[in-house]
């Protein structure tokens, strides 16, 4: 069975947007009257009109996403219950660069699955972090992978490790603050075994360990964004890998050619995967934890 999506939401959205533009045409038209030969004013009015039209389209998207989520909130995404008969090899890739979190990784490693390994892909330059990573690896029998440079940053870090590696079937991407549930692997594999065209499975997330006012207030955006936007995108249109808390099949990774060395490598990888015939699915029943940035400066750096 293949996972299928519908473009119905976007057809309705564009149609509603065009109606809004048609109703506003008279107002736009009158704004250009009296411009005369003032070309600078004309150009500014054109730019202003285009910006307004774009923001209306973006606003329509927000309205329709919320509406379709509300409309279908009782229609839970079909969660696979297929049994896994074989024992595919899964590797956890913990990516870190001067932000190692031993507690998060230790919790993520407590998987109710036998055939998996954990690798720390360490791009750290800070000696204290390197020392901490080495101590954790020794205590927990985890392999640490380092490289001479930081070409490609996170994407390059993952590609450097997976280049030429064949002894695995799936890999899971973990950020430094990521905590995945104990049944992450077993639940994720059911999606791949149920839908043959899935190449990427993006898990659900909540914000946890909020220790200050900034985190408690703004983390609500995380808790509302994941179930609303991702469940809608799962059924309508295009869903992207969001960089962490996700499982990727080896076949998808190999056929796509790895992660591109760009800023939004997760989005670009998802597009390349779609072009190769793979799709990205959302797993609402696999709930991972992430930490919200501690302040505005950390938030700005994060985005």
Model feature map: region roles:
Residues 1-84:
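N-terminal membrane-anchoring/stem segments of glycan-assembly enzymes
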Residues 88-91, 117, 268:
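Cell-envelope/extracellular polymer assembly enzymes that use nucleotide-activated donors
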Residues 106-115:
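Short, acidic, metal-binding catalytic loop of nucleotide-sugar glycosyltransferases
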Residues 114, 122-132, 148-151:
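A conserved acidic beta->alpha catalytic loop
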Residues 135-138, 145-170, 182-263, 296, ...:
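Long helical/loop segments within the catalytic core of UDP-sugar-dependent glycosyltransferases
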Residues 261, 270-288:
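Catalytic donor-sugar/metal-binding loop of nucleotide-sugar-dependent glycosyltransferases
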Residues 284-299:
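Active-site donor/metal-binding and catalytic loop motifs
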């Amino acid at each position: 069975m293949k996972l299928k999506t519908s473009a119905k939401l976007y057809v309705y959205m564009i149609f509603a947007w065009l109606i809004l533009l048609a109703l506003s045409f008279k107002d736009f038209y009158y704004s250009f009257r009296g411009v005369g030969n003032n070309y600078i004013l004309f150009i500014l009015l054109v730019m202003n009109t285009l910006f307004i039209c774009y923001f209306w389209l973006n606003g329509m998207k927000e309205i329709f996403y919320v509406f379709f989520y509300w409309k279908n909130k009782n229609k839970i995404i079909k969660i696979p219950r297929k049994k896994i008969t074989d024992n595919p090899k899964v590797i956890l890739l913990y990516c870190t660069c001067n932000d190692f979190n031993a507690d998060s990784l230790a919790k993520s490693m407590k998987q109710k699955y036998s055939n998996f390994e954990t690798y720390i892909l360490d791009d750290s330059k800070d000696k204290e972090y390197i020392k901490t990573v080495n101590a954790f690896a020794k205590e927990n029998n985890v392999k640490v992978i380092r490289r001479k440079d930081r070409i490609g940053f996170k994407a390059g870090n993952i590609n450097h490790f997976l280049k030429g590696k064949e002894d695995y079937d799936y890999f899971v991407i973990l950020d430094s603050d990521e905590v995945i549930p104990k049944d992450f692997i077993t639940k994720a594999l059911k999606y791949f075994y149920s839908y043959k065209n899935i190449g990427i499975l993006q898990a659900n997330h909540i914000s946890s360990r909020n220790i200050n006012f900034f985190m408690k207030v703004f983390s609500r955006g995380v808790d509302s964004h994941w179930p609303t936007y991702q469940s809608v995108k799962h059924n309508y249109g295009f869903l992207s890998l969001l960089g962490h808390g996700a499982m990727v099949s080896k076949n998808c990774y190999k056929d796509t050619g790895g992660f591109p060395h760009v800023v939004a490598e997760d989005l670009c990888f998802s597009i390349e995967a779609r072009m190769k015939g793979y799709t990205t699915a959302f797993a609402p029943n696999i709930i991972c934890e992430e930490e919200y940035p501690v302040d505005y400066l950390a938030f700005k750096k994060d985005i």
